[in-house]
Structures are given as C-alpha cells and as structure tokens.
Curated annotation (Swiss-Prot):
Source species, domain of life: Eukaryota
Protein name in UniProt: Vesicle-associated membrane protein 7
Gene Ontology CC: one annotated term: SNARE complex
CDD domains membership: Longin (cd14824), R-SNARE_VAMP7 (cd15871)
Topology with respect to the bilayer: Single-pass type IV membrane protein
Protein purpose: Involved in the targeting and/or fusion of transport vesicles to their target membrane during transport of proteins from the early endosome to the lysosome. Required for heterotypic fusion of late endosomes with lysosomes and homotypic lysosomal fusion. Required for calcium regulated lysosomal exocytosis. Involved in the export of chylomicrons from the endoplasmic reticulum to the cis Golgi. Required for exocytosis of mediators during eosinophil and neutrophil degranulation, and target cell killing by natural killer cells.
Sequence similarity: Belongs to the synaptobrevin family.
Encoding gene (name): VAMP7
Organism encoding this protein: Pongo abelii (Sumatran orangutan)
Transmembrane segments: 189-209
Biological process, per Gene Ontology: calcium-ion regulated exocytosis; endoplasmic reticulum to Golgi vesicle-mediated transport; endosome to lysosome transport; eosinophil degranulation; neutrophil degranulation; phagocytosis, engulfment; protein transport; vesicle fusion
Amino acid sequence: MAILFAVVARGTTILAKHAWCGGNFLEVTEQILAKIPSENNKLTYPHGNYLFHYICQDRIVYLCITDDDFERSRAFNFLNEIKKRFQTTYGSRAQTALPYAMNSEFSSVLAAQLKHHSENKGLDKVMETQAQVDELKGIMVRNIDLVAQRGERLELLIDKTENLVDSSVTFKTTSRNLARAMCMKNLKLTIIIIIVSIVFIYIIVSPLCGGFTWPSCVKK
C-alpha cells in the first residue's frame, strides 16, 4: 500500500517526476494529463487496481498514482504538500518552464515526500479523521478510459522490485540445488567406474597369478 508515482506538469508538459518502482508510468500519465481540463479542480480516476489522484491549480497539475487500497485523504495530503513546496520554490516560473526543467531539483523532494506520506502512520487519530473529511469534500471519483496511440486499451504495468528480488533468489536457489545434484551424480558415476575397473583388473590378473588368491604372485 503506497504512492507509486508522482508528477508535476503544466498541461501535458512534465516538469518533474519520481517513481517508487518500475512501470509504464509516463505512457499512462501522458494519457491522463491530456484529459485533465485546465481549470482548477481535484479528482480521482480509478483504473484497474490503481487510483490516479490529481490537483490542478493555475494550469499546473500535481498527480500521483497509488494502490487502490491507499487512503484518498493521504494521497491528497501528499499532493497538497507537493503543491505548496513547488509553488514556494518556483512560483510563476512554472508557467513558462521547459519540459523537465525542475526535475533535477524537485524529483528529490517528490521522492522524500512520497516515502513520508506512504509510511507515516503516526498522525493523531482525531486530526487525521478531520483532515480526511475536509480533504475529500468536493473531490469526485470519475472513471476514465485510457487508449494508447495504436488504439488498444492502455493498462498500467507495475514492476515492483520485491517481485524481481524474490524471483532472483528463487532462480539462484534452484541453480545451486541443480549444481549440487549434478555434482553428486558425477561423484557416484566416478566411484562406480573405479570399482568396475578394479574388478576387471582382478579378473584379468587372477589366472596369471595362479587363482583368485594370487598364490604365485603373493610372497609368503
């Protein structure tokens, strides 16, 4: 349960972004930004197992993507904090800035606030409840269809690091077990070859030494 991605944009022009994990965030976000009207507004778009929350103020869009079980109030608290910090830092410069002009500086702010609002659960319960009521007043939830340029339905694909780590550990463990099994198999085969060779040599040499006890070859 976390905030997965955050972006600040002017219309469809991305000014700063940060992703918590891998995924096709930009491809999906570009479709979302193109559908957001320029007037001041707050809205949530559900899409599959994820929610897209945004605040639009003075043509600047503050947007984040969360799991569908992440509290909307926490998402909008995050967006409000990002909006306040961005406006304080850049002011009217955002209205004419080039794409990614603020990314080198503000992406670290997005990362820090994303982590803080995803993990912080120590708020006073009364204040938290009141903040939820106040924050969600007038914020609608509206369905949205995302269509890629090729005309196919666009889906958000998330590549969370934990899954990759688990797969890597499983692969390494399987490889190690396979190598151990092959080593034991080779060892058994080597022992069998040695035993067969000894028996074969014994059978060949025995007639030359006068029998199976080798009486003519063993000195008494």
